[in-house]
Design a protein with these regions (language model features):
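Bacterial Sec-dependent N-terminal signal peptides
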Residues: 1-29
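Catalytic-core regions of glycoside hydrolase
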Residues: 32-82, 94, 131, 207-215, ...
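Aromatic-lined substrate-binding rim segments of carbohydrate-active enzymes
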Residues: 84-166, 226-247
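Conserved, mostly hydrophobic/aromatic
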Residues: 98, 193, 206, 239, ...
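Active-site groove signature of glycoside hydrolases
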Residues: 163-225
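Extracellular/luminal regions of secreted and cell-surface proteins that mediate adhesion/ECM remodeling
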Residues: 380-518
Length: 518
């Protein structure tokens, strides 16, 4: 009776306390709802140097048809000189993704004989070497053979597909993408490809067009040009039906699907790209830093999808080969100075708020590390998405069965965003509050469903209050944890946070202590 009287007296005086400002807004809400108010706040400083290797963010290195088992050593990828050669690093210590430019013929030269199933094949060993170095895969499969080798397996031609010879090499054949036999065979291949590689643990993205010159979605040669839109719908439908879990990307080229490679933007291009995006595609571009090719149309298209889709960057100039990059209209690139191009690519990537940048291969990757290593580290620090909790408020004493509040604020240090809004991810990454017992067992998890990671962009932090029910917990000492979990994997940590490594436990960030009394 005495306890009831005291509680009744306190509730009678609550309006007075609130009116006088003696109770915080959060405490007011907590007391009125039966949730225990906060007791302690911890502030976090971000880790701005560690390479996190989260999905769909960070550096991408390239591999292609020239790979062999000695590649990592002979091309110095396992010991790449930096800063003029005063030390070396592994390229894979900075690249989280390895993008493999490959062709259909290399993957299935004989119908139904898929090279990724053959442990003795060069491609199988290539893929294994990438995974051994802690990188995810990405793919573009080319079918057009012009300027390259035989990219489509000849069994397609033998089955009756119509096509054309490379004018510069009549021994090389390519199929018309509007040919029914080609489409039937390619659909079968892509379905098998997806069975093996529609796995986000192994694959970061699929460059899901692959038609035209170099697979870049321009210079497409049809049997009948009137089939252009029909072919675009067919290829994007085929990829979207095959790949459900791995993000698909397409080059936002001003002449996407057209027969020419450069001109004023085609009136169809924006509409076609929007059709692909509606099917779940995200976007990339293959000419960053080429200011005569990456112009206002491209900038406007990227701006329209800023923080709505992740943007993947590829530089356009090949600085160590035949490209005369010093004639770029910007006038900023000096002959013999690859580092000028690297800076131009970096600036344009920052302006576009890209999530991923390319190291590519050859002189590109060598110059990124040798003369522009500061930019490699800078992008890790300020590009893509880089998430961490700025502060967490929690109770440090409670009773079993009580409901307590945890207040948590989040920040993205990167100029990009965490694309939990794309259909392949379906919001699978969430904030989670957890409790760990004295034996390091996770005994309680509570998702912060209201927290949308895709809304955390520079200048717009996330602020949330999550209620945790302590029902079922025994008397004892516990540790508050917070993390970014993968809800498709029993809410285990799925994204790495930019916090001090000393605060981490199996991907969770340790926040503070909680003592539970019965």
């Amino acid at each position: 009776m005495k306890r009831y009287t005291l509680l009744r007296t306190f509730m009678l005086f609550m309006p007075v306390l609130i009116h006088c400002g003696w109770v915080s807004a959060h405490a007011q809400s907590a007391m009125l709802k039966g949730v225990k108010a906060l007791g302690q706040t911890v502030y976090f400083e971000p880790d701005t140097t560690s390479v996190l290797k989260n999905p769909l963010t960070g550096w991408v290195m390239y591999l292609g048809r020239a790979w062999d088992e000695n590649f990592w050593q002979t091309h110095h990828y396992d010991a790449m000189p930096v800063n003029g050669g005063d030390s070396t690093v592994r390229v894979s210590d900075y690249a989280g993704t390895c993008y493999i430019r490959i062709n259909w013929n290399m993957l299935e030269s004989k119908e139904g004989d898929y090279v990724w199933n053959d442990p003795d094949s060069r491609i199988y060993k290539l893929l294994a070497s990438v995974r051994e170095r802690g990188m995810r895969l990405a793919f573009r499969s080319n079918v057009d053979s012009r300027d390259q080798g035989q990219n489509t397996p000849l069994y397609v031609k033998e089955a009756g597909a119509k096509g054309f010879q490379d004018p510069n090499n009549p021994q090389i054949w390519s199929p018309y993408p509007d040919d029914a036999v080609f489409q039937q065979k390619y659909e079968k291949f892509l379905q098998a490809f997806a069975v093996a590689f529609d796995d986000p643990d192994k694959v970061d993205f699929i460059d899901a067009y692959g038609l035209g010159k170099w697979g870049e979605a321009h210079g497409v040669k049809y049997n009948n040009y009137s089939n252009k839109v029909e072919v675009f719908e067919w290829i994007t439908d085929t990829y979207a039906k095959a790949f459900k879990r791995v993000p698909l990307v397409i080059n936002y080229h001003r002449l996407v699907g057209d027969t020419i490679s450069w001109a004023e933007p085609h009136p169809d291009s924006k509409r076609l790209l929007e059709r692909a995006i509606a099917k779940g595609y995200t976007i990339r571009h293959d000419a960053f830093g080429m200011t005569g090719y990456y112009e206002q149309w491209e900038k406007d298209f990227a701006r329209a999808y800023r923080f709505r889709l992740p943007i993947i960057m590829e530089g356009g100039w090949i600085t160590g080969a035949h490209h005369r990059y010093w004639i770029d209209p910007s006038g900023k690139y000096r002959q013999g100075h690859s580092e000028d191009v690297r800076w131009g690519e970096y600036e344009e990537s920052r302006n576009a708020h890209v999530n991923m940048m390319d190291l590519r291969i050859g002189d590109e990757v060598a110059s990124w590390f040798n003369s522009s290593f500061d930019l490699v580290k800078r992008f890790e620090r300020e590009g893509g998405y880089r998430l961490y909790p700025t502060e967490v408020s929690f109770v440090n004493k409670a009773r079993s069965g009580e409901r307590v509040s945890v207040q948590h604020n989040w920040r993205n240090l990167g100029w990009g965003y965490c694309p939990t809004n794309i259909p392949q991810w379906k919001g699978k990454y969430k904030v989670c509050i957890a409790l760990m017992d004295a034996n390091h067992n996770i005994v309680k998890k509570q998702l912060a469903d209201e927290a949308d990671l895709s809304t955390w962009v520079q200048g717009r932090d996330g602020h949330y209050t999550t209620t945790v029910n302590l029902d079922g917990l025994q008397k004892g000492n516990y540790t508050w944890l917070i993390g970014l979990v993968d809800t498709t994997k029993a809410c285990q940590p799925g994204l790495k946070m930019a916090v001090d490594k000393n605060l981490l436990f199996e991907g969770w960030c340790k926040v503070g202590k909680l003592k539970i009394n019965n």
